[in-house]
Protein backbone atom coordinates (compact mmCIF):
# COMPACT_ATOMS: atom_id res chain seq x y z
CA UNK A 1 0.00 0.00 0.00
CA UNK A 2 1.10 3.50 -0.72
CA UNK A 3 2.49 5.60 2.06
CA UNK A 4 0.51 8.68 2.91
CA UNK A 5 1.80 12.09 1.86
CA UNK A 6 4.75 13.25 3.94
CA UNK A 7 5.23 16.94 4.57
CA UNK A 8 5.68 19.49 7.31
CA UNK A 9 3.40 22.38 8.23
CA UNK A 10 5.51 25.19 9.61
CA UNK A 11 2.84 27.77 10.25
CA UNK A 12 -0.55 29.09 9.30
CA UNK A 13 -1.21 32.73 9.73
CA UNK A 14 -3.19 35.74 8.64
CA UNK A 15 -1.39 38.16 6.38
CA UNK A 16 -1.73 41.90 6.33
CA UNK A 17 0.07 43.97 3.75
CA UNK A 18 0.05 47.70 3.14
CA UNK A 19 0.55 48.66 -0.45
CA UNK A 20 1.89 52.12 -1.06
CA UNK A 21 1.96 53.53 -4.54
CA UNK A 22 3.95 56.68 -5.06
CA UNK A 23 3.23 59.18 -7.79
CA UNK A 24 5.68 61.89 -8.64
CA UNK A 25 4.73 65.07 -10.46
CA UNK A 26 7.18 67.53 -11.87
CA UNK A 27 6.30 70.97 -13.05
CA UNK A 28 7.32 74.62 -13.21
CA UNK A 29 6.75 77.94 -14.95
CA UNK A 30 9.06 79.46 -17.48
CA UNK A 31 9.93 83.14 -17.53
CA UNK A 32 10.63 85.07 -20.69
CA UNK A 33 13.98 86.19 -19.39
CA UNK A 34 17.36 85.49 -20.89
CA UNK A 35 17.61 82.46 -18.53
CA UNK A 36 14.74 80.63 -20.22
CA UNK A 37 16.91 78.47 -22.45
CA UNK A 38 19.18 77.62 -19.56
CA UNK A 39 16.19 76.64 -17.45
CA UNK A 40 14.83 74.47 -20.25
CA UNK A 41 18.17 72.75 -20.55
CA UNK A 42 18.30 72.07 -16.82
CA UNK A 43 14.74 70.74 -16.83
CA UNK A 44 15.51 68.45 -19.74
CA UNK A 45 18.64 67.18 -18.04
CA UNK A 46 16.67 66.59 -14.87
CA UNK A 47 13.95 64.76 -16.80
CA UNK A 48 16.50 62.59 -18.59
CA UNK A 49 18.04 61.72 -15.24
CA UNK A 50 14.63 60.85 -13.83
CA UNK A 51 13.78 58.68 -16.83
CA UNK A 52 17.10 56.93 -16.47
CA UNK A 53 16.39 56.26 -12.83
CA UNK A 54 12.94 54.92 -13.69
CA UNK A 55 14.46 52.59 -16.28
CA UNK A 56 17.07 51.44 -13.80
CA UNK A 57 14.38 50.79 -11.21
CA UNK A 58 12.26 48.94 -13.78
CA UNK A 59 15.18 46.72 -14.69
CA UNK A 60 15.62 45.90 -11.02
CA UNK A 61 12.00 45.21 -10.09
CA UNK A 62 11.23 42.94 -13.03
CA UNK A 63 12.34 40.13 -10.73
CA UNK A 64 9.79 41.14 -8.11
CA UNK A 65 6.38 39.46 -8.56
CA UNK A 66 4.81 42.36 -6.67
CA UNK A 67 5.83 44.63 -9.54
CA UNK A 68 3.24 42.89 -11.72
CA UNK A 69 0.46 41.80 -9.38
CA UNK A 70 -1.31 43.37 -6.41
CA UNK A 71 -1.77 40.21 -4.35
CA UNK A 72 -0.88 41.38 -0.82
CA UNK A 73 1.15 38.36 0.33
CA UNK A 74 3.08 37.86 -2.89
CA UNK A 75 6.24 39.47 -1.50
CA UNK A 76 6.44 36.73 1.12
CA UNK A 77 6.45 33.97 -1.51
CA UNK A 78 10.22 33.67 -1.92
CA UNK A 79 9.92 30.76 -4.32
CA UNK A 80 8.35 32.96 -6.98
CA UNK A 81 11.41 35.21 -7.18
CA UNK A 82 13.78 32.25 -6.88
CA UNK A 83 12.26 30.64 -9.95
CA UNK A 84 12.07 33.89 -11.99
CA UNK A 85 8.26 33.94 -11.99
CA UNK A 86 7.92 37.68 -12.58
CA UNK A 87 10.06 37.55 -15.70
CA UNK A 88 8.07 34.55 -16.89
CA UNK A 89 4.78 36.38 -16.33
CA UNK A 90 6.03 39.21 -18.53
CA UNK A 91 6.02 36.60 -21.32
CA UNK A 92 2.81 34.73 -20.46
CA UNK A 93 0.49 34.12 -17.55
CA UNK A 94 -0.83 30.89 -18.96
CA UNK A 95 -4.28 29.96 -20.18
CA UNK A 96 -7.49 28.42 -18.87
CA UNK A 97 -7.21 26.01 -21.81
CA UNK A 98 -4.38 24.28 -19.93
CA UNK A 99 -5.66 21.60 -17.57
CA UNK A 100 -3.60 20.43 -14.60
CA UNK A 101 -4.96 17.44 -12.71
CA UNK A 102 -4.07 17.74 -9.02
CA UNK A 103 -4.18 14.29 -7.41
CA UNK A 104 -4.18 15.10 -3.72
CA UNK A 105 -6.38 15.58 -0.64
CA UNK A 106 -9.05 17.67 -2.36
CA UNK A 107 -9.51 21.42 -2.32
CA UNK A 108 -11.46 24.25 -0.76
CA UNK A 109 -13.68 24.86 -3.78
CA UNK A 110 -14.79 28.23 -2.44
CA UNK A 111 -11.36 29.63 -1.62
CA UNK A 112 -11.10 33.26 -2.74
CA UNK A 113 -7.84 32.60 -4.62
CA UNK A 114 -8.84 29.31 -6.25
CA UNK A 115 -12.54 29.20 -7.12
CA UNK A 116 -12.09 31.11 -10.39
CA UNK A 117 -9.48 28.65 -11.68
CA UNK A 118 -11.28 25.37 -11.13
CA UNK A 119 -11.65 23.17 -14.19
CA UNK A 120 -15.21 22.89 -15.49
CA UNK A 121 -16.14 19.61 -17.09
CA UNK A 122 -17.88 20.70 -20.32
CA UNK A 123 -20.08 17.60 -20.23
CA UNK A 124 -21.40 18.53 -16.79
CA UNK A 125 -21.79 22.26 -17.37
CA UNK A 126 -24.82 24.20 -18.56
CA UNK A 127 -28.45 23.09 -18.58
CA UNK A 128 -29.85 19.68 -19.47
CA UNK A 129 -32.94 18.99 -21.62
CA UNK A 130 -35.17 19.67 -18.62
CA UNK A 131 -33.59 23.02 -17.89
CA UNK A 132 -31.71 21.75 -14.83
CA UNK A 133 -28.11 22.57 -14.03
CA UNK A 134 -26.00 19.63 -15.19
CA UNK A 135 -23.58 20.22 -12.33
CA UNK A 136 -26.22 19.34 -9.75
CA UNK A 137 -28.91 17.32 -11.55
CA UNK A 138 -27.72 13.95 -10.27
CA UNK A 139 -27.22 12.63 -13.79
CA UNK A 140 -24.09 11.38 -15.54
CA UNK A 141 -24.62 13.80 -18.41
CA UNK A 142 -21.37 13.06 -20.23
CA UNK A 143 -21.68 9.30 -19.59
CA UNK A 144 -18.13 8.96 -18.32
CA UNK A 145 -19.18 6.90 -15.30
CA UNK A 146 -19.10 9.79 -12.80
CA UNK A 147 -22.18 11.76 -11.75
CA UNK A 148 -21.90 15.56 -11.61
CA UNK A 149 -18.09 15.53 -11.77
CA UNK A 150 -18.02 19.20 -12.69
CA UNK A 151 -14.62 20.02 -11.12
CA UNK A 152 -13.20 16.52 -10.68
CA UNK A 153 -13.88 13.51 -8.46
CA UNK A 154 -13.46 12.21 -4.93
CA UNK A 155 -12.07 8.67 -5.25
CA UNK A 156 -12.07 8.17 -1.49
CA UNK A 157 -15.83 8.54 -1.04
CA UNK A 158 -16.74 7.96 -4.69
CA UNK A 159 -18.63 11.21 -5.14
CA UNK A 160 -18.10 14.76 -6.37
CA UNK A 161 -17.46 16.29 -2.94
CA UNK A 162 -13.91 17.64 -3.12
CA UNK A 163 -13.65 19.14 0.38
CA UNK A 164 -10.12 19.16 1.78
CA UNK A 165 -9.96 17.81 5.33
CA UNK A 166 -6.20 17.98 5.35
CA UNK A 167 -5.11 21.24 3.71
CA UNK A 168 -2.36 19.75 1.56
CA UNK A 169 -4.36 19.63 -1.67
CA UNK A 170 -5.50 23.24 -1.32
CA UNK A 171 -1.90 24.29 -0.69
CA UNK A 172 -0.62 22.48 -3.78
CA UNK A 173 -3.42 23.87 -5.97
CA UNK A 174 -2.54 27.38 -4.82
CA UNK A 175 1.11 27.03 -5.79
CA UNK A 176 0.14 25.84 -9.24
CA UNK A 177 -2.74 28.16 -10.02
CA UNK A 178 -3.90 30.68 -7.44
CA UNK A 179 -5.52 33.63 -9.17
CA UNK A 180 -3.30 36.66 -9.72
CA UNK A 181 -4.10 40.35 -9.53
CA UNK A 182 -7.27 39.97 -7.47
CA UNK A 183 -5.90 41.82 -4.42
CA UNK A 184 -6.15 38.60 -2.43
CA UNK A 185 -3.47 36.35 -0.97
CA UNK A 186 -0.87 35.13 -3.43
CA UNK A 187 -0.40 34.22 -7.08
CA UNK A 188 0.12 30.76 -8.49
CA UNK A 189 2.87 29.92 -10.96
CA UNK A 190 0.30 29.65 -13.76
CA UNK A 191 -2.42 32.04 -12.56
CA UNK A 192 -4.86 31.38 -15.41
CA UNK A 193 -4.70 27.59 -15.44
CA UNK A 194 -7.65 25.20 -15.02
CA UNK A 195 -7.32 22.94 -11.97
CA UNK A 196 -8.89 19.47 -12.22
CA UNK A 197 -9.24 18.22 -8.64
CA UNK A 198 -8.88 14.49 -8.00
CA UNK A 199 -9.06 13.47 -4.35
CA UNK A 200 -7.28 10.23 -3.45
CA UNK A 201 -6.61 10.62 0.29
CA UNK A 202 -8.61 11.83 3.29
CA UNK A 203 -7.26 11.64 6.87
CA UNK A 204 -10.82 11.36 8.19
CA UNK A 205 -11.52 8.19 6.23
CA UNK A 206 -9.68 5.19 7.75
CA UNK A 207 -8.26 2.28 5.76
CA UNK A 208 -8.29 4.19 2.50
CA UNK A 209 -6.61 2.35 -0.36
CA UNK A 210 -4.34 5.16 -1.51
CA UNK A 211 -2.74 3.19 -4.32
CA UNK A 212 -6.06 2.07 -5.79
CA UNK A 213 -7.39 5.63 -5.60
CA UNK A 214 -4.22 6.99 -7.20
CA UNK A 215 -4.52 4.66 -10.17
CA UNK A 216 -8.20 5.51 -10.62
CA UNK A 217 -7.39 9.22 -10.47
CA UNK A 218 -4.64 8.90 -13.10
CA UNK A 219 -7.00 7.04 -15.42
CA UNK A 220 -9.65 9.71 -14.92
CA UNK A 221 -7.18 12.49 -15.75
CA UNK A 222 -6.17 10.70 -18.94
CA UNK A 223 -9.77 10.07 -19.95
CA UNK A 224 -10.93 13.62 -19.28
CA UNK A 225 -8.17 15.41 -21.17
CA UNK A 226 -5.73 16.68 -18.55
CA UNK A 227 -2.47 17.98 -20.02
CA UNK A 228 -0.43 17.69 -16.83
CA UNK A 229 -0.82 15.44 -13.79
CA UNK A 230 0.61 16.71 -10.49
CA UNK A 231 1.17 13.97 -7.91
CA UNK A 232 2.75 14.63 -4.54
CA UNK A 233 2.29 11.22 -2.95
CA UNK A 234 4.25 8.03 -3.31
CA UNK A 235 5.84 5.04 -1.68
CA UNK A 236 8.68 2.55 -1.89
CA UNK A 237 6.68 -0.31 -3.41
CA UNK A 238 6.69 -0.83 -7.16
CA UNK A 239 3.21 -1.19 -8.65
CA UNK A 240 2.84 -2.53 -12.16
CA UNK A 241 -0.74 -1.27 -12.34
CA UNK A 242 0.32 2.23 -11.35
CA UNK A 243 3.23 2.07 -13.80
CA UNK A 244 0.83 1.10 -16.57
CA UNK A 245 -1.51 3.98 -15.72
CA UNK A 246 1.34 6.49 -15.95
CA UNK A 247 2.54 4.81 -19.14
CA UNK A 248 -0.93 5.27 -20.64
CA UNK A 249 -0.62 8.96 -19.82
CA UNK A 250 2.78 8.90 -21.53
CA UNK A 251 1.28 7.42 -24.69
CA UNK A 252 -1.25 10.24 -24.70
CA UNK A 253 1.50 12.86 -24.33
CA UNK A 254 0.43 13.84 -20.80
CA UNK A 255 3.17 15.13 -18.52
CA UNK A 256 3.40 13.50 -15.09
CA UNK A 257 5.14 15.63 -12.45
CA UNK A 258 5.94 13.63 -9.32
CA UNK A 259 7.47 14.36 -5.93
CA UNK A 260 10.83 12.70 -5.30
CA UNK A 261 9.69 12.05 -1.74
CA UNK A 262 10.59 13.13 1.78
CA UNK A 263 12.35 9.99 2.97
CA UNK A 264 15.81 11.59 3.40
CA UNK A 265 17.23 8.96 1.08
CA UNK A 266 19.08 8.41 -2.17
CA UNK A 267 16.42 7.35 -4.67
CA UNK A 268 19.07 5.75 -6.87
CA UNK A 269 19.48 3.15 -4.14
CA UNK A 270 16.05 3.22 -2.50
CA UNK A 271 13.40 3.84 -5.12
CA UNK A 272 10.34 5.98 -4.58
CA UNK A 273 7.32 5.55 -6.85
CA UNK A 274 5.75 6.79 -9.06
CA UNK A 275 8.58 9.34 -9.41
CA UNK A 276 11.12 6.59 -10.22
CA UNK A 277 9.25 4.76 -12.95
CA UNK A 278 11.41 4.80 -16.07
CA UNK A 279 8.96 6.69 -18.29
CA UNK A 280 9.69 9.65 -20.54
CA UNK A 281 6.73 11.73 -19.38
CA UNK A 282 7.77 11.79 -15.71
CA UNK A 283 9.58 14.71 -14.11
CA UNK A 284 10.85 13.81 -10.64
CA UNK A 285 11.28 16.86 -8.41
CA UNK A 286 13.23 17.44 -5.21
CA UNK A 287 13.04 20.47 -2.91
CA UNK A 288 15.53 23.26 -2.20
CA UNK A 289 15.77 26.11 0.30
CA UNK A 290 16.48 29.77 -0.56
CA UNK A 291 20.23 29.02 -0.71
CA UNK A 292 19.68 26.26 -3.30
CA UNK A 293 20.53 23.47 -0.89
CA UNK A 294 18.45 20.31 -1.13
CA UNK A 295 16.37 19.94 2.01
CA UNK A 296 17.66 17.35 4.46
CA UNK A 297 14.23 15.72 4.40
CA UNK A 298 14.11 15.42 0.60
CA UNK A 299 15.03 12.45 -1.54
CA UNK A 300 17.74 12.95 -4.15
CA UNK A 301 19.49 10.95 -6.88
CA UNK A 302 21.72 11.63 -9.88
CA UNK A 303 19.91 9.07 -12.01
CA UNK A 304 16.37 9.22 -10.63
CA UNK A 305 15.66 12.84 -9.63
CA UNK A 306 15.43 15.28 -12.53
CA UNK A 307 15.34 18.81 -11.15
CA UNK A 308 14.98 20.89 -8.00
CA UNK A 309 12.49 23.62 -7.15
CA UNK A 310 11.58 25.75 -4.11
CA UNK A 311 10.16 23.61 -1.31
CA UNK A 312 10.92 25.16 2.08
CA UNK A 313 8.41 27.38 3.89
CA UNK A 314 6.31 27.86 0.78
CA UNK A 315 3.38 30.22 1.21
CA UNK A 316 0.11 29.12 -0.39
CA UNK A 317 -3.61 28.68 0.12
CA UNK A 318 -5.23 26.74 2.96
CA UNK A 319 -8.92 25.91 3.54
CA UNK A 320 -11.33 28.59 4.77
CA UNK A 321 -9.74 31.44 2.80
CA UNK A 322 -6.53 31.20 4.80
CA UNK A 323 -2.88 30.99 3.84
CA UNK A 324 0.10 29.25 5.38
CA UNK A 325 3.52 27.69 4.99
CA UNK A 326 4.35 24.11 4.10
CA UNK A 327 7.61 22.37 3.29
CA UNK A 328 8.52 19.37 1.15
CA UNK A 329 8.97 17.91 -2.30
CA UNK A 330 5.20 18.24 -2.72
CA UNK A 331 5.56 22.00 -2.90
CA UNK A 332 8.53 21.77 -5.26
CA UNK A 333 6.53 19.49 -7.54
CA UNK A 334 3.74 22.04 -7.76
CA UNK A 335 6.23 24.67 -8.94
CA UNK A 336 7.28 22.46 -11.83
CA UNK A 337 3.69 21.62 -12.77
CA UNK A 338 2.92 25.32 -12.91
CA UNK A 339 5.97 25.89 -15.09
CA UNK A 340 4.90 23.13 -17.46
CA UNK A 341 1.46 24.73 -17.75
CA UNK A 342 3.06 28.02 -18.80
CA UNK A 343 5.29 26.32 -21.38
CA UNK A 344 2.43 24.31 -22.88
CA UNK A 345 0.10 27.27 -23.22
CA UNK A 346 2.79 29.62 -24.52
CA UNK A 347 3.66 27.51 -27.55
CA UNK A 348 0.58 25.31 -27.83
CA UNK A 349 2.64 22.25 -26.89
CA UNK A 350 -0.27 20.22 -25.56
CA UNK A 351 0.11 16.44 -25.37
CA UNK A 352 3.83 16.72 -26.16
CA UNK A 353 5.13 15.77 -22.73
CA UNK A 354 8.69 14.69 -23.67
CA UNK A 355 9.35 18.02 -25.40
CA UNK A 356 8.00 20.08 -22.52
CA UNK A 357 10.07 17.99 -20.14
CA UNK A 358 13.24 18.65 -22.11
CA UNK A 359 12.67 22.40 -22.14
CA UNK A 360 12.13 22.55 -18.39
CA UNK A 361 15.11 20.36 -17.53
CA UNK A 362 17.53 21.97 -19.97
CA UNK A 363 16.76 25.57 -19.07
CA UNK A 364 17.09 25.39 -15.31
CA UNK A 365 19.93 27.19 -13.55
CA UNK A 366 22.88 24.96 -12.74
CA UNK A 367 24.06 24.90 -9.14
CA UNK A 368 27.08 23.20 -7.60
CA UNK A 369 24.93 22.15 -4.66
CA UNK A 370 22.81 20.04 -7.01
CA UNK A 371 25.59 18.21 -8.85
CA UNK A 372 25.37 15.10 -6.70
CA UNK A 373 21.66 15.49 -6.02
CA UNK A 374 19.87 15.58 -9.38
CA UNK A 375 20.29 14.27 -12.89
CA UNK A 376 20.58 17.72 -14.43
CA UNK A 377 22.23 19.62 -11.55
CA UNK A 378 19.61 22.31 -12.19
CA UNK A 379 16.95 24.28 -10.36
CA UNK A 380 13.77 25.49 -12.04
CA UNK A 381 13.90 28.75 -14.00
CA UNK A 382 10.44 29.67 -15.29
CA UNK A 383 11.63 32.53 -17.47
CA UNK A 384 14.27 30.52 -19.29
CA UNK A 385 11.89 27.64 -19.88
CA UNK A 386 9.71 30.07 -21.83
CA UNK A 387 12.26 32.24 -23.58
CA UNK A 388 14.20 29.39 -25.12
CA UNK A 389 11.03 28.71 -27.06
CA UNK A 390 11.17 32.22 -28.43
CA UNK A 391 14.92 32.39 -29.02
CA UNK A 392 15.88 33.30 -32.53
CA UNK A 393 19.34 32.55 -33.84
CA UNK A 394 20.90 35.75 -35.10
CA UNK A 395 23.86 35.35 -37.43
CA UNK A 396 25.51 37.33 -40.18
CA UNK A 397 27.83 36.66 -43.08
CA UNK A 398 28.00 35.97 -46.79
CA UNK A 399 27.45 32.49 -48.19
CA UNK A 400 30.48 31.82 -50.36
CA UNK A 401 31.86 28.98 -52.46
CA UNK A 402 34.44 26.80 -50.76
CA UNK A 403 34.96 29.12 -47.82
CA UNK A 404 33.60 28.81 -44.31
CA UNK A 405 31.11 31.53 -43.61
CA UNK A 406 31.83 33.28 -40.33
CA UNK A 407 28.85 33.92 -38.11
CA UNK A 408 27.76 34.35 -34.54
CA UNK A 409 24.93 32.49 -32.88
CA UNK A 410 22.93 33.57 -29.87
CA UNK A 411 20.58 30.62 -29.82
CA UNK A 412 20.83 27.67 -27.45
CA UNK A 413 21.93 24.81 -29.66
CA UNK A 414 23.27 27.11 -32.37
CA UNK A 415 23.83 26.47 -36.06
CA UNK A 416 26.71 25.07 -38.05
CA UNK A 417 27.78 26.02 -41.56
CA UNK A 418 29.43 23.43 -43.78
CA UNK A 419 31.51 23.71 -46.94
CA UNK A 420 30.12 22.55 -50.23
CA UNK A 421 31.79 22.77 -53.67
CA UNK A 422 28.79 24.58 -55.12
CA UNK A 423 26.55 25.54 -52.26
CA UNK A 424 26.68 26.51 -48.64
CA UNK A 425 24.28 24.71 -46.31
CA UNK A 426 22.93 25.70 -42.94
CA UNK A 427 22.44 22.66 -40.76
CA UNK A 428 20.81 22.28 -37.39
CA UNK A 429 18.87 19.80 -35.33
CA UNK A 430 15.21 20.75 -35.52
CA UNK A 431 12.20 19.67 -33.53
CA UNK A 432 14.18 17.35 -31.28
CA UNK A 433 15.99 15.03 -33.61
CA UNK A 434 14.73 15.88 -37.09
CA UNK A 435 17.49 17.19 -39.33
CA UNK A 436 16.76 20.45 -41.11
CA UNK A 437 18.89 21.56 -44.04
CA UNK A 438 18.31 24.97 -45.53
CA UNK A 439 20.10 25.48 -48.84
CA UNK A 440 21.31 28.98 -49.62
CA UNK A 441 22.74 30.14 -52.93
CA UNK A 442 26.32 31.48 -53.06
CA UNK A 443 26.43 35.21 -52.46
CA UNK A 444 23.30 35.25 -50.34
CA UNK A 445 23.64 37.61 -47.43
CA UNK A 446 22.27 36.26 -44.16
CA UNK A 447 22.49 39.15 -41.81
CA UNK A 448 20.32 38.96 -38.69
CA UNK A 449 18.17 36.29 -40.20
CA UNK A 450 15.92 34.43 -37.79
CA UNK A 451 16.67 30.74 -37.80
CA UNK A 452 13.26 30.03 -36.32
CA UNK A 453 11.74 31.29 -39.55
CA UNK A 454 13.52 28.43 -41.23
CA UNK A 455 11.65 26.15 -38.87
CA UNK A 456 14.46 25.52 -36.43
CA UNK A 457 13.61 24.87 -32.81
CA UNK A 458 16.81 25.04 -30.72
CA UNK A 459 17.17 21.74 -28.91
CA UNK A 460 17.99 21.78 -25.21
CA UNK A 461 20.86 19.50 -24.27
CA UNK A 462 20.13 17.08 -21.44
CA UNK A 463 23.06 15.09 -20.11
CA UNK A 464 21.21 11.79 -19.84
CA UNK A 465 17.84 10.60 -21.02
CA UNK A 466 15.80 8.66 -18.53
Enumerate the language-model features and the residues they cover.
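Acidic-leg catalytic submotif of subtilisin-like serine proteases
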Residues: 84-156, 175, 229
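C-terminal subdomain of the subtilisin-like protease fold in secreted/lumenal serine endopeptidases
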Residues: 3-9, 19-24, 35-43, 226-231, ...
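Hydrolase catalytic cores
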Residues: 14, 175-176, 196-201, 227-228, ...
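Autoinhibitory propeptides
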Residues: 2-76, 120, 452, 463-466
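Substrate-binding/access-modulating region of protease and related hydrolase catalytic domains
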Residues: 95, 179, 197-281, 291, ...
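Catalytic-core environment of secreted peptidases
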Residues: 147-148, 198, 287-330
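Subtilisin-like peptidase catalytic core
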Residues: 105, 143, 149-237, 289, ...
Amino acid sequence: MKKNITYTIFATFSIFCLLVVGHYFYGGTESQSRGTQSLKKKLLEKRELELGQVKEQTDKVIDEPSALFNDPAIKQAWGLKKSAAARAWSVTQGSSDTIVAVIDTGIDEFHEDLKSNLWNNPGESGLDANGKDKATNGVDDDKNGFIDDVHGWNFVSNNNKLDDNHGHGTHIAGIIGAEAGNKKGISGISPKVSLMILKYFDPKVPSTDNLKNTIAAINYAVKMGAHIINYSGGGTDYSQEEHDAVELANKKGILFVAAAGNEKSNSDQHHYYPADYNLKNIISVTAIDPTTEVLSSSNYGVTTVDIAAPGQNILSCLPNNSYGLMTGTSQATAFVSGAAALVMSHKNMYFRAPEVKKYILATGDTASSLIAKTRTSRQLNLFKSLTILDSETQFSGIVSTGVNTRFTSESHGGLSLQNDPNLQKVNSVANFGKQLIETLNPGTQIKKKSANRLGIVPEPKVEQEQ
